[in-house]
Amino acid sequence: KYFTSFGYIDQESFFKSRDFDYKRYNTRSNIDIKVNERINFSVDLSYRQDIRERPAKTALSNIWIDLSTAQPIFPTRLSENMVIPDPSISSVSYSGSTTGNRNPLARSDRNVFGTYDRFDNTFRGKIGFKYKVPGITGLTLRADMNLTLLDRSEKTFRKPYNVYRQNLDTNELILEGVGNGVSSISDSQFRRTMVYPLISAEYIKEVGKHNLKVLILAEQTTRKFSMFSATRKNLFTTSIPELFIGSENEQTNDGSSGPDIGRKSAVARV
């Protein structure tokens, strides 16, 4: 027997920029093989990719903060006929916040604020074996091996943008602040592996009006991880969001690895 499925999800956000959408691709395949009356094999495989693309990792919470400090007397966008002093840098309208560099619309737009891209690739596999012992009716031996692999990639890109207050009387733009004052880019990779073997023996027998059930099993869980990250600031240009564009004078690196879970257990039940 076998079963195979494919899935796709495209979830739209409620922002006009559509920069908070979520996508997922997944596939699954299960195969059960009956060799004979005593031996059975099973193989279960699944893969899933989650894609999150937004202006920032914590953009949603910061958008509500910017909205709470914005004043309704200021326009949400600059007038189209305004002459931008520096067209090479994105420009947004002043929202009335005391810090001067806040704008909720800027935080919801990847073209203005920057980008945060996260890709999760998850693989799960299971191989099972079941054997009915001849000569001992009701005794079944079973062995399973489970494996889970997670590969996560995250990239964060920040670029400065100017926040202008518009003087309608003089048709002049006044610089109130700069969002993301320093351009930067960071890239991180995270990998995690979990191995879960299990063996069991089950004995079932009817004795008159009674049922006898005995179960003995042993299992082990091992999970290991590794991660590293790198960041550079003061990019030579914001048109190429890659690490090599940043200055080597302002770079940081980090990383770690090791086991975070290890467990063994045995169970017996009558």
Question: Where do the language-model regions lie?
Answer:
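Long hydrophobic segments that form regular secondary structure
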Residues: 130-135
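Surface-exposed loop/interface segments of Gram-negative outer-membrane beta-barrel transport/assembly proteins
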Residues: 1, 13-20, 28-122, 142-143, ...
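Transmembrane beta-strand segments that form the barrel wall of outer-membrane beta-barrel proteins
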Residues: 8-12
